[in-house]
């Protein structure tokens, strides 16, 4: 795929933050009838890896990349500020890994939809392993790479409010990897923005940000592929 396709297609993509208002109904109707590979599993236990690496915003998803540090999309973090809260791997009304306050937001300087968020180490509301963020979550490690045909999974909180913060895992094949773009055929919905894109070993290959708004067999989902430059930016902004 030409690396410009994703950029030029933004007008026809769903930016996958759960929102209310104009456009939401259209997106939901399209996604309910999508023909993209629809291998979606409801996660029963979020207190085991890889699910302990995922966090929920009120309208989107993020994941842990290091000490007190999570990753999401710029189009997610722009709606948040220092002092706002995130919840570690909630499992609807069955508990969570604690609630934490945002202390710093750092956006990637390039065009890629990547944002680092640091949180306060001590929880506002404790998780099952106490008040320390790092005791209640598990950071992801990077994959060596990814290529077309490999299987990936996207883990996140589609329609988090509507679905009462139930975690879902969607799987499918990689369609292409070029530059900082990874394209895959996996069913995603509003709220999946910021979800980790993982290989079969639960290693990070990218971060999810959008999907096509169309109803045919070629409907794809899009992520930012973790290039060395993006990995370097993330490493430099892990909380010390």
Swiss-Prot record:
PROSITE patterns: V8_HIS (PS00672)
Keywords: Hydrolase, Protease, Secreted, Serine protease, Signal
EC number from the UniProt entry: 3.4.21.-
Signal sequence annotation: 1-36
Chief site of localization: secreted
Enzyme class, first EC level, given as a word: hydrolase
Disulfide bond annotation, renumbered to this chain: none
Short name of one Pfam family: Trypsin
Localization: Secreted
PANTHER family: PROTEASE DO-LIKE 5, CHLOROPLASTIC (PTHR43019:SF23), SERINE ENDOPROTEASE DEGS (PTHR43019)
UniProt function note: Serine protease that cleaves specifically after the sequence Trp-Glu-Leu-Gln.
Recorded family membership: Belongs to the peptidase S1B family.
Protein's name in the database: Serine protease SplB
